[in-house]
Regions:
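ATP-binding/phosphotransfer module of carbohydrate and carboxylate kinases, centering on a glycine-rich
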Residues: 14-199
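A short, polar/charged loop-to-alpha-helix boundary motif
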Residues: 2-16
Length: 199
């Protein structure tokens, strides 16, 4: 949590697709249902996000392309909000909640945004975020994150060799525990850390 009790939530960020709305209007269960309904021409859409996931998987009848695109839209809007957060906070990103089960359809568009470019007026391009973004769910990328880019440099103050991360990096990971369990584990670890500092 932050100094004022904020938990690092980005739901109130500006929505990249609908700039007058908050990000949660495109990054939520209801957003997946709305996006699917719009693409499939179903109004009102009474399906659940799980139904739409099953359609995307091909295990339920429906418009597979619309189902995949509805999750991709979520990933794109979430990616923009996450990019803004990563521009200010040097950390890792954990995707959680029930919708995380659809990560195979969410992560590609999210990673595309996070690995994208932004331009200046003169056409000069910059990486969307300063860090190299690794997909923790991909074994090769996980190994590269864990094993690559480290080198030793000599400290100008002590003269000792110290480890140096030559590439700024972060990960995008999907919670396997669910939001409640992950929150509980984080709170427990936070409490233990503070107890250690007080003893």
């Amino acid at each position: 949590t932050g100094d004022n009790g904020c938990g690092g939530d980005i739901w109130l960020s500006q929505n990249a697709k609908f700039p007058d709305l908050i990000a949660e209007e495109s990054v939520s269960k209801r957003a997946v249902v709305r996006a699917y309904g719009e693409r499939a021409g179903i109004n009102p859409c009474t399906l659940t996000p799980k139904d739409i996931f099953d359609i995307a998987e091909g295990t339920r009848d429906g418009n597979r392309l619309a189902a995949k695109e509805s999750f991709a839209e979520l990933g794109e809007v979430a990616g923009v909000a996450i990019a803004h957060a990563l521009d200010m906070i040097d950390g890792i990103v954990i995707i959680g909640g029930g919708i995380a089960g659809a990560s195979p359809y969410i992560l590609p568009s999210m990673l595309e945004v996070l690995r994208g470019k932004l331009a200046m007026m003169d056409g000069q391009l910059f990486d969307r975020v300063e860090m190299k973004v690794f997909n923790w769910e991909d074994r090769a990328e996980r190994n590269e994150f864990l094993n690559g880019h480290d080198q030793e440099v000599v400290s100008p103050i002590s003269g000792r060799k110290v480890p140096y991360h030559s590439v700024r990096r972060t990960i995008i990971a999907v919670s396997e525990d669910g939001a409640s369990t992950s929150t509980m584990k984080g709170a427990y670890a936070f409490a233990l850390m503070h107890m250690d500092h007080q003893s």
